[in-house]
């Protein structure tokens, strides 16, 4: 009888262990909804931006697309710096919260025409803090040997991204066009606000994921320093946006060859800066480690080169993908019949 009881206990324990092996961390739900609402707010605002600039602020088509291009380009650029600042100073969780708050402010600033550049600056910097740290925070939820659960977790995480991106144009886009532009932007802001509230309420479910040692995610005792960083970042991004808009009439006077030469010169300057900073960091690292240890091995260089090759194709893909918020939106607005199952009374006569 005792053997049967022991076997039953072992069977129950094995069943529970199997369930636990496939059960995702509770923190994944928090990140899932935070990312879903962030993507809802981003794609909701993106679906309205170009149409709002042209139909409400009387921008020309070229100027509206230029501003949209600047905004989108900086949205993809700032996560590099946001991720670096989070790794070195803030920690992922605090950077995530800072980015979320900035985006809430940015979306509601879109309701005021005079605050357009400030709104875009807040959204860009907020995205820079938020976007890289959500993805990496998902990975921090799992321990060693949980590669299978981590892979499944990322699949669930990307379902949240797709769900938010799917709902945004249907809800925020419809409100913006049919009711009023500011209602659409406010809808995106409300979505981001829900994401922030849900993120704050779910902090305990994330455990120590994304935190530095002895760090409290909602401790902003160094608020003055943080405000200085964030304020300087927003001001710098706003200056870039305004600068591009200010110099765009002169850029239009350049020929295509001159524009290409200017772009190549800027790219060369960036590469020189990166190589110079890399050589400086390499020399500092070399002075601190034995000569027998190379900072980057041959196999690591091969992986870096592979990443750069893949990155070239990714850039081409996202360049085409982001036309959905610009040229494709204008094409759909001007050349697409969006009425279904409409009966024309004239056709009956």
Model regions: which residues?
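Central cavity-lining transmembrane alpha-helices of secondary-active solute carriers
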Residues: 69-84
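Loop-to-transmembrane helix entry/capping segments in MFS-fold secondary transporters
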Residues: 61-62, 145-157
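Interfacial helix-cap and linker-helix signal at transmembrane-aqueous boundaries
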Residues: 53-54, 85-87, 171-179
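Intracellular loop-helix junctions on the cytosolic face of multi-pass helical membrane proteins
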Residues: 2-26, 145, 173-349
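Helix-loop boundary and gating motifs at the non-cytosolic
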Residues: 24-72, 309, 318-331
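C-terminal ends and interior cores of transmembrane alpha-helices
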Residues: 101-117
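Intracellular juxtamembrane helix-capping segments at the cytosolic ends
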Residues: 129-144
């Amino acid at each position: 009888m005792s053997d049967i009881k022991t076997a039953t206990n072992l069977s129950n324990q094995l069943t529970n262990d199997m369930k636990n092996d496939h059960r995702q961390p509770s923190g994944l739900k928090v990140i899932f909804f935070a990312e879903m609402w962030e993507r809802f707010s981003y794609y909701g605002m993106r679906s309205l931006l170009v149409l709002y600039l042209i139909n409400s602020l009387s921008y020309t088509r070229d100027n509206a697309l230029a501003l949209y291009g600047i905004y989108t380009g900086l949205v993809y650029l700032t996560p590099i710096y946001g991720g670096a600042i989070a790794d070195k100073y803030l920690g992922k969780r605090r950077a995530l919260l800072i980015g979320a708050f900035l985006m809430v402010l940015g979306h509601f600033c879109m309701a005021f025409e005079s605050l357009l550049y400030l709104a875009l600056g807040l959204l860009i910097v907020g995205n820079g803090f938020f976007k890289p740290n959500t993805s990496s925070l998902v990975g921090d939820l799992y321990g060693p040997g949980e590669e299978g659960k981590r892979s499944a977790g990322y699949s669930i995480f990307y379902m949240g991204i797709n769900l938010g991106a799917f709902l945004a144009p249907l809800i925020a886009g419809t409100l913006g066009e049919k009711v009023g532009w500011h209602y659409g932007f406010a809808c995106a802001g409300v979505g981001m606000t829900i994401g922030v509230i849900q993120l704050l309420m779910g902090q305990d479910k994330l455990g120590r994921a994304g935190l530095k040692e002895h760090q409290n995610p909602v401790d902003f005792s160094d608020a003055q320093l943080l405000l200085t960083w964030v304020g300087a970042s927003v001001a710098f991004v706003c200056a870039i946006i305004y600068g591009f808009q200010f110099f765009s009439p002169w850029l239009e006077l350049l020929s295509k060859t001159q524009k290409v030469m200017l772009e190549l010169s800027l790219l060369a300057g960036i590469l020189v800066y990166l190589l110079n900073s890399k050589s400086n960091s390499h020399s500092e690292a070399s002075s601190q480690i034995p000569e027998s240890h190379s900072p980057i091995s041959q196999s690591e260089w091969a992986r870096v080169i592979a990443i750069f090759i893949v990155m070239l194709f990714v850039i081409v893909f996202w360049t085409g993908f982001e036309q959905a918020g610009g040229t494709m939106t204008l094409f759909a607005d001007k050349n697409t019949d969006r009425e279904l199952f409409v009966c024309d009374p004239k056709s009956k006569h």
